[in-house]
Amino acid sequence: MTPWFLYLIRTADNKLYTGITTDVERRYQQHQSGKGAKALRGKGELTLAFSAPVGDRSLALRAEYRVKQLTKRQKERLVAEGSGFAELISSLQTPEIKSD
């Protein structure tokens, strides 16, 4: 299983873009070259502010959604300290269902 990553990219006007990928460096280069998300095109210099492995695609999609719901201040705390990231991921993981 290919691991998925959550990443945040900072734009020149200090906004944070959140995305997921299996290859952070490749995806960052796509954004830099204008071949990534439309939201980042023409936004000036981009910097990779944060990235972390999150598990499978399903978990990555849930983590991306949850991070996009955070306030700017909470995202900045995540970037600066990784604050709460482990808790966020563990809260998204579904408990295993045991069969008898």
Swiss-Prot record:
Lineage: superkingdom: Bacteria
A Pfam match: GIY-YIG
Residues in GIY-YIG domain copies: 2-77
InterPro entries membership: GIY-YIG_endonuc, GIY-YIG_endonuc_sf, UPF0213_domain, UPF0213_GIY-YIG_endonuc
UniProt xrefs under SUPFAM superfamilies: GIY-YIG endonuclease
Sequence similarity: Belongs to the UPF0213 family.
HAMAP family: UPF0213 (MF_01029)
Protein name (record): UPF0213 protein YhbQ
Recorded name of the encoding gene: yhbQ
